[in-house]
Regions:
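Long, well-ordered core segments of solenoidal/helical folds
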Residues: 259-271, 309-332, 374-395, 439-459, ...
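C-terminal catalytic domain of Rieske-type non-heme iron oxygenases
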Residues: 335-338, 519-523, 550-583
């Protein structure tokens, strides 16, 4: 199975840089009019962009053994040996630029000059619309020469231009292209040079993205004019300002920072057509429900990590959430424009915006945000919608879908109601107009302790997963919303008898999804019956530090990037590759527990 090294910035994502070949298999970007993600792809046999170096007419990066590192834990860089040539390729999506750069450096180790060709070739085979499912676009792909960049323009039309991408280089480059009958376009960009003995040559290829020809070409030209060194320095400075170092643990440092930047650039992004910041599950089509919005995923998982690293970005996220997404708070999933994708009420998602807002204020002490009209209206909407789901006999609130998005067994879920308690209790402390919610929160806690606490055959109390207020309950847990987190939300102490009994039950070998006797002994559930990375994050947040350190040493996940679940023996990804919001929650939990 191929492994990938994703990278990206706010505007463009490179989800599939192939670790074996160095080829860029696709480029993705967010598009508001399409309600999701556009994916520009190569063919099965030829990537969209393949770096190559020819010595005496033979050789390429794809046939050499590539060794990989990441500058500042985010910018992929490969090194390889091709005969007497030492090759280095660096992939840089500069901060605040609508595009990316590929720097190719060749060092001649021989004692004589060498004629070398440094270039890129590839195939634009198809374009796709991605929101959960991937659907091919039916417009027309074109390629032509343009004076705007003195090179090629790749442009897509559906009655009018939808998007374009265009290359430029900082050295003299020859270009050619062929349009095939099947609609695919192949191309070649090449720089011919003679490298002296012990000499070095370098070429930077810039790729600009835009709505049409001029925007794409000038996006590339802007990076060219700024120069590669300036763009690289700016980007590395930005990354270094947000990196975290775990003293004496290089592996944990890399894991944290790579996942942090993956979260920042794959769970948020700026749309090409409207230039709005939006939040999504993942900007990688490799994730099985990509490019859509979930209140829970964005606000309970990715938001805490981004708030840790960049409070200003976190505030922008809240503006989007309480603006575009406000009217459908609590609905299963939505498109990036705020309209409903998958219907179904989820209680944890309804209060997720409150929890994120409270977290932001506690971190920054910026209470001015509470006077923002969108925030005021959003809080009012949540409180009104919450009342619609209140039980007739007590202060418990129902849900239709569980935190996995699967249908409930019983309507009153303990974890979800703890979130309601937490959100109202904290909101009551933020402003006088919400002080009355303190009493409501107390009544919710009383209802949880009265109705959600059950007893086993030996009379030991524990928290049931869900109840129906008619005496029925189930013993269960879900990593996306775990009972393990009750102390994290200050609902109870980690030493509380009821809590300890609950955790013992769901972690016992008798519990089907505990994986207690496996090397990766974290909790799963029927949605993905393997240990979840979210469960590992939950364990970090509830104090199982040494247990988690041991697992972090063993797991590979998705080539070092967080995924939904891993094999309980090998630690390799089993479901949910490129899970950007999960990457954020893993980072936040690592920072809370291990920094």
């Amino acid at each position: 199975m191929d492994k990938y090294l994703p990278t990206g910035n706010d505007f463009v994502s490179l989800p599939r840089i192939n670790e074996r070949t160095g080829g860029i298999e696709d480029i993705t970007f967010l598009y508001m009019a399409a309600k999701g993600l556009i994916d520009i792809r190569g063919s099965e046999s030829t990537p969209l962009i393949q770096p190559y170096v020819h010595l005496d007419g033979v050789g390429s990066l794809s046939s050499a053994h590539l060794a990989w590192t990441r500058l500042d834990d985010w910018l992929p860089q490969s090194t390889a040996q091709l005969g007497s040539l030492e090759l280095k390729t660096l992939y840089v999506p500069p901060i605040d630029e609508r595009g990316f750069a590929i720097q190719m450096t060749v060092h001649n180790t021989s004692e004589s000059a060498q004629d070398v060709v440094i270039g890129l070739n590839g195939c634009w085979a198809s374009s796709w619309h991605c929101v959960n499912e991937d659907k091919p676009l039916s417009g027309k792909a074109t390629c032509f020469r343009s004076g705007w960049n003195s090179s090629l323009i790749f442009e897509y039309h559906a009655g009018f231009p939808m998007f374009a991408f265009a290359p430029m280089a900082d050295a003299q480059t020859d270009s050619s292209f062929t349009c095939s009958y099947d609609g695919s376009i192949t191309y070649d960009l090449s720089h011919h040079c003679t490298i002296a003995a012990d000499g070095t040559a370098s070429v930077v290829f810039y790729w600009g993205l835009g709505f049409e020809e001029v925007a794409a070409a000038t996006s590339a030209k802007e990076m060219l004019r700024q120069t590669f060194d300036v763009e690289l320095t700016k980007t590395r400075t930005w990354l270094q300002e947000r990196r975290v170092t775990f003293n004496g643990d290089a592996k944990l440092t890399q894991l944290y920072n790579t996942n942090l930047f993956f979260c920042m650039f794959f769970s948020t992004g700026i749309t090409l057509d409207t230039e709005e910041l939006v939040l999504v599950t993942s900007r990688s089509p490799r994730y099985y429900v990509s490019a859509a919005y979930w209140d829970r995923d964005s606000l309970l998982w990715s938001f805490p990590a981004i708030l840790d690293a960049d409070p200003e970005r976190a505030k922008e996220m809240l503006s989007y959430v309480f603006g575009r997404q406000r009217r459908n708070f609590g609905i299963h999933s939505r498109y990036i424009d705020g309209t409903v994708l998958e219907p179904g009420f989820e209680l944890d998602e309804l209060v997720a915006p409150l929890l994120a807002l409270e977290r932001y204020i506690n971190k920054t002490d910026d209470k001015s945000i509470l006077s923002d009209p969108d925030i005021v209206q959003g809080i009012s909407l949540i409180l009104n919608r919450l009342r619609q789901h209140e039980a007739a006999s007590c202060r418990l609130y129902d849900t239709f879908l569980q935190p996995t998005d699967d249908e409930h067994v019983y309507p009153y879920i303990t974890y979800d109601n703890v979130l309601v308690w937490k959100s109202l209790k904290d909101l009551a402390q933020l402003a006088p107009q919400y002080a009355h919610l303190e009493k409501t929160a107390d009544e919710i806690k009383d209802a949880i302790m009265t109705h959600c606490v059950q007893k086993d055959a030996e009379g030991k109390p524990y928290f049931g997963w869900s109840i129906d207020l008619n005496g029925s309950h189930d013993v269960y847990d879900e990593p996306p919303g775990s009972l393990q987190l009750l102390p994290f939300f200050d609902f109870c102490s980690p030493t509380d008898e009821i809590y300890r009994n609950t955790v013992a039950m769901i972690r016992s070998p008798e519990y089907k999804y505990s994986f207690a006797n496996s090397p990766i002994n974290e909790i799963g559930c029927p949605h993905a019956p393997h240990p979840w990375i979210l469960s590992l994050a939950n364990s970090l947040l509830c104090g199982r530090v040494e247990h988690c350190r041991a697992i972090l040493e063993k797991i590979s996940m998705d080539n070092g990037i967080a995924c939904e679940s891993v094999d309980e023996v090998t630690g390799y990804c089993t479901t949910g590759e490129a899970f950007a919001t999960c990457a954020g929650f893993l980072c936040h939990s690592i920072r809370e527990a291990l920094l």
